[in-house]
Amino acid sequence: MQIQIKNIVLTALFGLMLTGCASTANNDPLEGFNRGVYKFNDVADKAVIKPVAGAYKAVLPSPVRSGVNNFFDNLGTFVSVINDLLQFKFDKAVEGAGRFVINSTFGVAGLVDVASMDGIEKRKEDFGQTLGHWGVGSGPYLVLPFLGPSSIRDATGLAVDTLAFDPVVYVDDPATRNSAVALRMLDRRAQLLPGSDLLDEAALDPYAFMRDAYMQRRHHQIHDGNPPALDDEYDFD
């Protein structure tokens, strides 16, 4: 555990250092690298990930897939509650904790989203949003292998969430833990199947479209749906 905490701290500090050194005039200084990773992800997705996700969707009936999605969403609520606390959003943290308890008990370990039926809002907060909430800039845009769009700040946040806050990481058995991670990623990809081809068809430059959409979406999320006007931090010209 001490080694794990040390790794988390080092990852966070390294990410924050890079964020602090980033230029705000052009937030895609890594574009050459990013486009290479984007192309790799696209090839891997079309060759392997998308077909497997399609088979997953075809084989499992909708109620089963909904249960899987609800289960992992419920685990994600735990991560959101921690980040709400770190952002001092105590009312949202209490609401999220109540949602987690309701779904974990009456929802049969989260397989059924009872809380949404009761009108309790589903929210998602992560450590990248927490850093943004406290004024940490996004840093350069970054495309992660297999994971897709991110930024230096959000990649740092993802590392902290994954290594410290995600309940799955505390599963002792490696086979069970890795299977849970793989199933969660497969479920998320299966949900995106209906819109998989729209990006290539609609955008002249899918990479630039994805980058701009991601950065604007994160700006919106960090400000809880009421963001100030975008400044030159998001100017990619």
Which residue stretches match the model-derived regions?
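A glycine-rich, hydrophobic loop/mini-helix early in the fold
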Residues: 62-88
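A structured, mid-to-C-terminal "fold-capping" secondary-structure block
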Residues: 22, 129, 134-237
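Mid-length scaffold segments of soluble, non-membrane domains
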Residues: 74, 86-152
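Alpha-helical transmembrane segments of multipass membrane proteins
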Residues: 51-55, 81-82, 142
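Surface-exposed patches in mature extracellular/periplasmic domains of secreted proteins
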Residues: 64-67, 87-94, 116-117, 221-227
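Post-signal peptide N-terminal segment of mature Sec-exported envelope proteins
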Residues: 29-59, 73
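C-terminal motif of bacterial Sec signal peptides marking the signal peptidase cleavage site
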Residues: 17-20
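Bacterial N-terminal signal peptides that target proteins for export
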Residues: 1-10
